[in-house]
Amino acid sequence: MDRNQWTLALMALMRFAHRAFINPVSPLPKFSRLAFTQGASRLYATLHVDAGLQDNVVDKAAKPYLSRRLKFNAEHFKQDVSELCTTLNADYNEGVMNAVLNTYKENFERGAVLWKATSKEDGVAFRFYERKKVDVVGPAINNSLISGNHGMIPLITSWANFKKNAIASCDFDPAKGLCKTWIWLGGRHPTRDLLVAPNVPGTIRSLERKLISAGLHTVRHAAVDWRSSTVNLYFWVPRPLTLPVVNTLITLPGTPPINEEKLTLMKPFFKPNGFTFATTIDTATGKFKRVSFYALRLDGNNLPIMGDQLATFFKDAPSNDKTEMNIVAWSFAGGSNGSSNYIKGERSYIGDLEQVLDAWGSPI
């Protein structure tokens, strides 16, 4: 065949590819469709583009998702958790992992999973983000992950039913088991509405004026920590990250003010329209234990200075999502020397975390 005949044949082939392979209802796997299209593009470049421009044409074709782990697999996950724990010198317990994965088998398979770690040498954690409104407390009780008379059950049950579309997720430690139950509240809501929900302790309700005075008007998520009996409230703060804003918020747990030098390490990673801010509160006393500022959707090749522990975490924690999600949070607690302050890191593992958070309207 001469060049013109090759051209006609290829054009017909590309039209066929568009109909049969790119069609979203095509029975062929996504990988096959993308690989075919990229191969056809490469052939077209070979026939029609000068050698120096061929790579540019191919680069514009859709790239296939090369991961072999398109869906959550418990055995693969245990292996990945074990290897990451070894790398970070963190505790790992096979029996605990089996109990967690057996209890929440469908949640892990249906949801999106992410890794968690801090700049301290305090282990590895992971979370599943659910896509459906399901009970996550009952299975934990039935499988002895928490006690059936735990004092935090009425509160988290109330928040899980705060709105009809609220969704519960869970955090785990690979050596200790269930750590937190975490609620997406179905959108952004006035802080007061969450505080007056049934079964919220008076110690938490009494914080309304202090939270509002600090500019924390809008709440997005809430969580309970089963081990420390603390609660986490996550707020949307629709303001730029400035020194006065930061120093106002870190006074909640009694943290001394930071300076401009510290702020310059944080600010480049925050968007100007606002940020996610979290508080940790002791339910027994109503005291703020910790606050955190979350920088979201970070480029894995342009992360903040965070120390060797977290740098290793982001390098070695595998992500099988098509779009990696990297999150860093600066966490402040009381204490004059800053020894209780640290940095938190989160990273997508599998299940298309970006899609879940986008569906929630999250700035993440």
Curated annotation (Swiss-Prot):
EC identifiers of the protein: 2.5.1.-
Protein family per UniProt: Belongs to the aromatic prenyltransferase family.
Keywords carried by this UniProt record: Glycoprotein, Prenyltransferase, Signal, Transferase
GO molecular function terms noted in the UniProt entry: prenyltransferase activity
Record's protein name: Aromatic prenyltransferase
Further remarks about this protein from its record: The gene is not located within a recognizable secondary metabolic gene cluster.
Name of one Pfam family that matches: PTase_Orf2
Residues annotated as glycosylated: N142, N337
SUPFAM superfamilies per the UniProt record, alphabetical: Prenyltransferase-like
Physiological role: Prenyltransferase that attaches isoprenoid moieties to carbon atoms of aromatic substrates in an enzyme-catalyzed Friedel-Crafts reaction.
Encoding gene (name): ptf
The UniProt record lists the keyword Signal: yes
Signal sequence, renumbered to the chain: 1-22
